[in-house]
Structures are given as structure tokens and as C-alpha cells.
Amino acid sequence: MARKKKTRRITDIMPIRKADKKIDITKARSGKKLTCYELDAKAREDKKKRKHKGLASGSRHSAVEEKANKLQNEIKDPKIGSKKKIPLVVEFVNKPEKGQVIPVIKQVKKQDPMKELENLENNEILNELLDALDAGKTISKSDQQFVDECLDRISELMEELGIEDEDESEDDLYRTFERMDINQFR
């Protein structure tokens, strides 16, 4: 059995020596000399610092292991070494949660009625469908619905603008043709 050095334990029964008290060296009196107890405490602290000056025993072998442990701790970062593919172009910036969809409110820009009427009259699809109807061909329900909606909108716009759709008689057409100067179109 190894020998153990006896130490003096300070208990409530024993009186406290001044040497056993911890003295803060920083609290030393400014401008005055240190007492012998303070000098002893300071010397003991300095001796402890000098005693543990060197490296720990076996540090030559354990230093390599510590470096390896440090490297392993650094690699634990999940962002480093990830095999997950990262898209270069962000497709969806804000993904709403399931069931929480904000309905998009369509703001219809109100056009000038004259411009809208002009667009409807120059609509190629509408003109082709009207030509097909005039030729006696049958068109699908969706096409017929489109034609009806466009014609209704045209009549609304004409009423709003105060334009009356007059069916010109053949005599009126003949008179306008006679009055025209053909040289204007050359």
C-alpha cells in the first residue's frame, strides 16, 4: 500500500492560522509593504505555476490523437461533405403549406371601351368562327359559347359608346360607291 502524506484539515474545532487564509495578492495594500503572510502566499502561488510549467507526461504520444479528435469534431458539421444535390436555380421561393393556399385575386384592368371594341372586332378567332357559321358549318359548344360572349360584349360596348348598329340598305351602299373617287386609292 502506498504511503499517503498526512494533511492538516481545517475544521470548526481547530483555530485558523493566518497562513491558511487565502489572501488576494491583488488586494494588497497600495503603497505599503506586503506582510510576511502575504509574501508567503505569493511565493506559494509562484511555486505552483513554476511546478506545472512543462507538458503533461506522455504528451508526445497523445498530441497526435488530440489533433485527430479535433478534426473529427470539425467534420461533424452537416453542411460539409453532404452528397445531397443542390439546385442551382431556385424554382419555388415560397412553398405554402398543404391546405393553406392563398387564392390569387385577378385584377382585371378596365380597358378603354373604344379600344376593347376595336380588339373584339379585329379578333381573328372570332372572325373565323363567324365565317364558319355564315357558311353553314356547325361548331362545338365551347366555340359557340365564345362567339355568344364576344357578340354580347360587343353589343354592350356599342350601347355604352352610343354607337347604333344600322343595317345599311343596298341603295345607300350604291350611293356611297358612286360618290367615291377611285383616284384616291391609286
UniProtKB/Swiss-Prot annotation:
Role of this protein: A GTPase-activating protein (GAP) that modifies Der/EngA GTPase function. May play a role in ribosome biogenesis.
Instruction: Provide the residue span(s) of the region labelled Disordered.
Output: 42-77
* Species this chain originates from: Haemophilus influenzae (strain ATCC 51907 / DSM 11121 / KW20 / Rd)
Gene symbol of the encoding locus: yihI
Gene Ontology terms: biological process: ribosome biogenesis
User: Which ranges of the sequence are coiled-coil?
Assistant: none
| Self-association and partners | Interacts with Der.
What keywords are assigned to this protein?
A: GTPase activation, Ribosome biogenesis
- Please report which protein family the annotation says this sequence is part of: Belongs to the YihI family.
Record-level Gene Ontology MF annotations: GTPase activator activity
Q: What is this protein called?
A: Der GTPase-activating protein YihI
Q: Where is the composition biased (Basic and acidic residues)?
A: 62-77
